[in-house]
Amino acid sequence: MGFPKVERLLINYKTLDEFKKFKGCGAQELSMLEELQANIIENDSESPFYGIYYGGSLIARMSLYMKRNGGEPFEITGTYLELYKLEVLPNFQKQGFGEMLVNYAKGLQFPIKTIARIHSAGFWDKLNFQPVSVPDGDFYVWHPEVNLNTVTNEESA
């Protein structure tokens, strides 16, 4: 068995069965199942779902969506990622799998917005996400570091 890695999940009935193992918080769990079912029906091959398999079973998952914003009502302007429904099965929590998923999203080098679940503020703080409060609700954002030492081909010519 190799080291677990993050991969884009296929939209199929096997993934649907794997999702049923996750017992999230109420309607949020159901919406992820319904979302996957809708993608199966529409034969949508561009899956927004990412996960980690361990021993042939899905143990952690998230949804990742590319969005655009004009700057209001929060501090991200332009293209960013929305990270939703990050969940790790109870027997695999506190082993770094949630962090692996978030680091995968960070590696795409876009700002990230997420809505923290109850009692997860410490997790997002540890991963350098900043809390943001707006009239519609609270969430966390992460911005990629800008490397000012990077020289483009045009600048070096």
Swiss-Prot record:
CDD domains: NAT_SF
EC number(s) stated in the UniProt entry for this protein: 2.3.1.-
InterPro entries: Acyl_CoA_acyltransferase, GNAT_dom, YlbP
Record domain N-acetyltransferase: where: 9-147
Keywords annotated in UniProt: Acyltransferase, Transferase
Keyword Nucleotidyltransferase appears in the UniProt entry: no
Record GO terms (molecular function): acyltransferase activity, transferring groups other than amino-acyl groups
NCBIfam families named among the record's database cross-references: PRK13688.1
Name listed for the protein in its UniProt record: Uncharacterized N-acetyltransferase BALH_3551
Organism field: Bacillus thuringiensis (strain Al Hakam)
